[in-house]
Amino acid sequence: IVAIAQGGNGVFPFLNLPTGARQAAFGGSNITLYDNDLNFAFANPALLSEKTHNFLGLNYTNQFNDVNIGSAIYGRNFSDKDFMAFGIHYVDYGTFLETNEIDQTLGTFTAKDMAITAMYCRWLSPRWTMGVTMKPIFSFYERYSSSGLGFDLGFSYHNEKALFAAGLVLRNVGFQFNGYNSINGDNKQEILPIDLQ
C-alpha cells in the first residue's frame, strides 16, 4: 500500500501572511483601506496614494518556537498620479536540530522565506487607482532552495464623501524558476498560491 499526501494550494504560502498589525486585525488581507498605512499595499498595490509619500513601515513579530516574521516598506511618489513603494517580507522559521533515524544529532539547519517587492500605482481618476507588484521570491529550507517571481494586479475605488471603498486584486500570479529538489533529484516546479479577492 502506498500513501501519498498533498497539502496546501501552492508553493511559497508565506506570501498570504499579513505583513502588519492592522492588516492582521482586519482579517489578514484587507484590500480596500485607503489611508496612509503603507502596509496595506502588500495586499493591494492600488492602495498606494499621495497619503503614502515618504512613509516607512516596519513590522516584526516573534511567533511561537522562534518563528520570526517581518516586513519593511517605503513609499515614494513621483508625480501627483504615480506612486511607488519598495519592500521586503520575510519569515525565519528558526534553527532546527538535524537527527538521523536513531536520534543521533547530526547538526542544525535553518529555514527561511523572503519576497522583495516593487510596487507601482497609477491614479486613473479621482476615485480609481490601478496598481501592480513585482516580487522576486526566495526560499531556503535546510539544503533545499527555490526561487520564483510573482505579480499582483489590483484596482481600488474610493469615495471619501460617501465613506465607501472597494477593491479587486489578483495576487501571486507567477512561477518558480527552480523547484525544491526531491530525494531522487527531481526538480518539480509548483504553482504559486494564486488568490483573487
Located regions from the model:
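Outer-membrane beta-barrel porins/channels
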Residues: 4-27, 31-37, 53, 69-197
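A short, glycine/small-residue-rich beta-strand->loop->alpha-helix junction that serves as a flexible
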Residues: 63-65
